[in-house]
């Protein structure tokens, strides 16, 4: 935020920070306390910084993806899919970041979870 509030290098006139949390930042549930704690901290940073950022014309938003399939989560992803659940893809998360950077209301966080329906991307603002 320090750089952005003094930067004039912004042709569109919009300054935006998107924080990546997790649904674990709201609901816990993974059983990995360090991960859950770090994601709760990101939600706290979002809540604590967006008011100060607005004073400088900076929008601070967040996204909170549900389970996302990556190389690190491949083993769990296989079990997830075997149970008939559809994990997010990195493309789903990337799209949510891009949308949040241009459409998000400061202080908002978007849950990103793929469900078995025609849209494949369900976003709920919390």
Descriptions of predicted regions:
Residues 27, 48-58, 67:
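Active-site-adjacent segment of SDR/Rossmann-fold oxidoreductases
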Residues 22:
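Residue(s) in the substrate-gating loop at a strand-loop-helix junction
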Residues 38:
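Active-site helix of classical SDR
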Residues 1, 46-47, 94-97:
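Short-chain dehydrogenase/reductase
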Residues 62, 78-126:
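C-terminal helical subdomain
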Residues 64-75:
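Short, flexible catalytic-loop segment of classical short-chain dehydrogenase/reductase
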Residues 1-12, 50-51:
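Amphipathic alpha-helical dimer-interface segment in Rossmann-like NAD(P)H-dependent oxidoreductases
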Residues 28-32:
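Active-site "substrate specificity/gating" loop of NAD(P)-dependent dehydrogenases
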């Amino acid at each position: 935020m320090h750089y952005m509030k003094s930067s004039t290098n912004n042709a569109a006139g919009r300054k935006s920070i998107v924080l990546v949390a997790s649904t674990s930042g709201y609901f816990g549930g993974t059983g990995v306390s360090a991960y859950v704690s770090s994601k709760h901290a990101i939600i706290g940073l979002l809540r604590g910084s967006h008011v100060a950022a607005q004073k400088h014309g900076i929008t601070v938003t967040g996204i909170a993806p549900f389970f996302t399939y990556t190389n690190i989560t491949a083993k769990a992803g296989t079990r997830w899919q075997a149970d008939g659940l559809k994990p997010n893809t990195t493309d789903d998360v990337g799209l949510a970041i891009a949308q949040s950077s241009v459409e998000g209301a400061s202080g908002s966080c978007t849950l990103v979870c793929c469900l078995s329906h025609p849209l494949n991307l369900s976003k709920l603002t919390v």
